[in-house]
Amino acid sequence: MTKRIFFSIIHLLDCFFRNMFFIKGEVGGSKMAGLDQKKTPVLDAIKRYVDENVVQFHVPGHKKGKGIPEFAEYVGKRVLQMDANGMDDLDYANNPTGAIYEAEKLLAHAYHAESAYFLVNGTTAGVQAMIMSACEPGDRIILPRNAHKSTIGGIILSGAVPVYIQPEINEEIGISMGITEESLKSAIKENPHAKAVFLTNPTYYGITSDLKSLVRIAHRHEMAVLVDEAHGAHMSFHGDFPLTAMEVGADMSSASMHKTGGSLTQSSVLLVRSNMIATEKVKQVLNLTYTSSASYILMASLDIARK
């Protein structure tokens, strides 16, 4: 009990001081102060690569569209010239140190996170990475019954044990609602040693819960909070929207930038702001599940959409 009280005090102080720097409409944070959100490092690197007209002795095999002329004629040569492979001038998605590294810093800054990662396999990849980062085989994870199928995939891959919360049903309009404080407290009481709480916010019907209260409840019991924000990529950018996972102190979230943020289909983001989940663990999981041939077209679209 003493340990939990101490943990709760530390968490509340941590959230207070962090939120002094993370205010909706004033994106920032002392660690990333001064970042210019007008910059597009990945897109700029690709522009330089295309302008230099590099002779390709590397993949992809279509060679700037020469190998698929019918497709090139339809979509245009420029997009196929942008379809490049990892190299020093363009950076490497699996271990970024250049343009992608700078772009991901800007992304974290924009989303009020401590770190952020480009995803080219949708929020499905982000959801699975969150669960695998937070849970070991046998760990219990509390989640809503109406979670996306990617959540079930993450549970299978991690070996975690699901504990389901049945969301309330609005009989008038016939849809499931969000998770309530009471239902979460009940699930935690029955599973006090659960490792994480997984939430969908907003739901796929656009329903939002009192995320701030749910995060506070979970953290009070030393449980990490993971949030599927697939349909909430836009919510960080206007004060009239509900608070996001990063803004209320959740540990990780994944958002489909392609759904409501303007990037190309399949491109999403993974966001981390946690004292409970090590960044190195997240990187290890991503390196296990992430392609070694990330699309620069998709990453450039994330870069420009964030701007």
Give residue spans per PLM region:
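Conserved PLP-enzyme active-site core in the AAT-like
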Residues: G34, K39-K47, D51-N53, F71-Y74, ...
